[in-house]
Amino acid sequence: MDGQFEQKKKQKDETYDIEHLIACFSPMIRKKLSNTSYQEREDLEQELKIKMFEKADMLLCQDVPGFWEFILYMVDENS
């Protein structure tokens, strides 16, 4: 039961982190998009935010091995 709660909390924190990241980059995105035509700005801004969300989600959800797991993997690979 606690595992599900922790997983939901972690997922909620990751979503908040991604939303915060997008909010931080939004002014820069809007400034850069001022060089594009008015009709394309909203679409491009939305596409950029989608790409940022996808990449951040991929990076936050990766399972990175610990130091010793990595060492054991390298030893097994070289054997």
From Swiss-Prot:
Induction of expression: Positively regulated by SigO.
Keywords (A to Z) from UniProt: Activator, Transcription, Transcription regulation
InterPro entries registered for this protein in UniProt: RsoA-like
Highest taxon, organism lineage: Bacteria
Function: Together with RNA polymerase sigma factor SigO, positively regulates the expression of at least three operons, including oxdC-yvrL, sigO-rsoA and yvrJ. Required for the acid stress-dependent induction of the oxalate decarboxylase oxdC.
Listed name of the protein: Sigma-O factor regulatory protein RsoA
Species name: Bacillus subtilis (strain 168)
